[in-house]
Amino acid sequence: MSDHVYNLVKKHHSVRKFKNKPLSEDVVKKLVEAGQSASTSSFLQAYSIIGIDDEQIKENLREVSGQPYVVENGYLFVFVIDYYRHHLVDQHAETDMENAYGSTEGLLVGAIDAALVAENIAVTAEDMGYGIVFLGSLRNDVARVREILDLPDYVFPLFGMAVGEPAEDENGAAKPRLPFDHVFHHNKYHADKETQYAQMADYDQTISKYYDQRTNGNRKETWSQQIEMFLGNKARLDMLEQLQKSGLIQR
């Protein structure tokens, strides 16, 4: 049994600096086809992928994201929940389907479908020798992204992905993940607080040491401190409103 895929995904890290070398149309097509091969709930295929190589559109999205690698990459993908095609089917159906795709369950199905597709693309790209970085920052201004990409009703932007050849001086590395026993629960969830606290304390030390070594002492924060800072930041609180404006989560 080969460990090729295991070793590939274990060394994954986000790449934020790329060579100025566009992906070929053939590579883009192969990546999208790999994404389409992902599992999809009830064969709904409730997603679409928007491929972007137009420099002005990239620049407009960079203004939303605030990150230079939205422009400086080999290719940019944006992944969206897409029930527009299902809405078109609904126009000629005998049964009202909007109760389904406009529901909270419909949102979950579309988001999961898109995430599975994106991960297929990410792993395939890395197997080809490319680097990738996911871009949740496109949700900083959903209304603006919908305008830039001309998204119709029932289509919602989830995240982007920049892909390209890593720059020569790109020096990213895989970050230590939570301990195996902290994320894998056998048969039922183990919620013992003392065990959870002990495992998180150990992990905090691991992450602090990782940053200390990576930055020559310039960063030493723990994982818990990162989580407090991120989740304590009251950002993107308009998400429910934006989802509903898109025709999603109506019930």
UniProtKB/Swiss-Prot annotation:
Its cofactor is FMN. CDD domains: NfsA-like (cd02146). Keywords: Flavoprotein, FMN, NADP, Oxidoreductase. Transmembrane segments: none annotated. Its EC number is 1.6.-.-. Pfam families: Nitroreductase. It is an enzyme of class 1 (oxidoreductase). SUPFAM superfamilies: FMN-dependent nitroreductase-like. GO terms for molecular function: oxidoreductase activity. Reduces FMN, organic nitro compounds and disulfide DTNB. Involved in maintenance of the cellular redox state and the disulfide stress response. Belongs to the flavin oxidoreductase frp family. This is NADPH-dependent oxidoreductase.
